[in-house]
């Protein structure tokens, strides 16, 4: 796997197209690679029963596939600094995911050479997802990319007409909630298996040990995977996580929730659709790390009339920490909260 230098990248450059078949095995590997046991990603009957075309790959799979696509092009000497993702459609078994990308900008940020990319994933129906990526790239004049040792949490000015109920949410960061499992070499390998990612930094290789990271790291866009709960706790209904046998209680038995916390729901709203997210990456995650996260609401629009009825666009922040209390990444994402009668 060769690595690009910043000087050799051209704005407008097209990345080599990647075609990736989506099969039943792809979905199984997706469950293994992301630890996401939500039934619409592995149970076709259930997924169709709630109006989907079939079972479909999750957002973490899309992030992994875009990540593999970028590093296939730039090589392992570049580091991801930020990615964005917007899901537009679903990739299901039988589809061929076509991944395309373009260099949109070359810049220096704080003296660090960077490249910005615009990416798309499409199938026979149309565009399934779009993504952006900002990568730090080695330079012949400035040398190798330097791993980050810290990262700031993003800030946002609230909407000038933010509803009164949402003002009380601002500045309130939840307690930390830890993932169900520590990061492991095996889990990273499953992640690579699901999208056929050959990045040598994601394995205990001589290259990784001799690299700027001084050892194996985890794919940076796996932030949400590292905080997924135990498999026996994951489901549409957390109290009855197996949709095929609702009588089965969570296993191992769950104690009262003492840590973490979700995001508040605007009054009168009942449903949620993710609109998009932007992740930024800090201290690299490594096997053996125990990742936890906090939640905070940064913004909320006034009530809007949408295709789904009245709703609010709510911007939330997840901050991810390792066991040393270092920030390993942030996830800034917007949700459409809808389904109520309005008038709140």
What are these language model-derived features?
Residues 1-79, 140-276, 342-344:
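Hot-dog-fold acyl-thioester-processing enzymes
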Residues 1-16, 91-177, 273-344:
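HotDog/MaoC-like acyl-thioester-processing domains
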């Amino acid at each position: 796997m060769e690595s690009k230098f910043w000087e050799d990248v051209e704005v407008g450059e097209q990345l080599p197209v990647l075609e990736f078949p989506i099969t039943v095995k792809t979905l199984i590997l997706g469950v293994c690679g992301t630890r996401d046991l939500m039934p619409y990603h592995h149970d076709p009957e259930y997924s169709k029963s709630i109006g989907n075309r079939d079972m479909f790959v999750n957002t973490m799979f899309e992030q992994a596939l875009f990540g593999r696509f970028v590093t296939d092009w730039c090589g392992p000497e570049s580091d991801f600094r930020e990615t964005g993702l917007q899901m537009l459609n679903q990739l299901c078994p039988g589809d061929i995911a076509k991944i395309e990308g373009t260099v949109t900008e070359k810049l220096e940020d704080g003296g660090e050479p960077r490249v910005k990319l615009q990416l798309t994933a499409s199938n026979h129906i149309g565009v399934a997802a779009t993504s952006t990526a900002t990568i730090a790239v080695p330079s012949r004049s400035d040398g190798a990319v330097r791993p980050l040792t810290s990262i700031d949490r993003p800030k946002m000015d609230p909407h000038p007409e933010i509803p009164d109920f949402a003002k009380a949410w601002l500045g309130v960061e939840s307690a930390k909630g830890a993932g169900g499992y520590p990061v492991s070499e095996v889990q990273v390998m499953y992640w690579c298996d699901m999208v056929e990612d050959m990045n040598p930094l994601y394995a205990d290789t001589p290259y990784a040990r001799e690299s700027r990271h001084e050892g194996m790291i985890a794919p940076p866009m796996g932030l949400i995977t590292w905080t997924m709960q135990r498999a026996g706790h994951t489901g549409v209904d957390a109290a009855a996580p197996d949709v095929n046998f609702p009588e089965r209680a969570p296993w191992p038995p769950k104690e009262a929730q003492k840590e973490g916390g979700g995001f508040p729901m605007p009054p009168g709203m009942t449903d949620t659709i993710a609109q998009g997210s932007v992740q930024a990456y800090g201290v690299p995650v490594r096997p053996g790390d125990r990742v936890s996260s906090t939640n905070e609401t940064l913004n909320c629009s006034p009530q809007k009339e949408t295709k789904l009825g009245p709703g609010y666009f709510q911007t939330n922040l997840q901050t991810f920490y390792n066991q040393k209390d270092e920030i390993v990444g942030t996830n800034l994402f917007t949700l459409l909260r809808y389904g109520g009668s309005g008038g709140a």
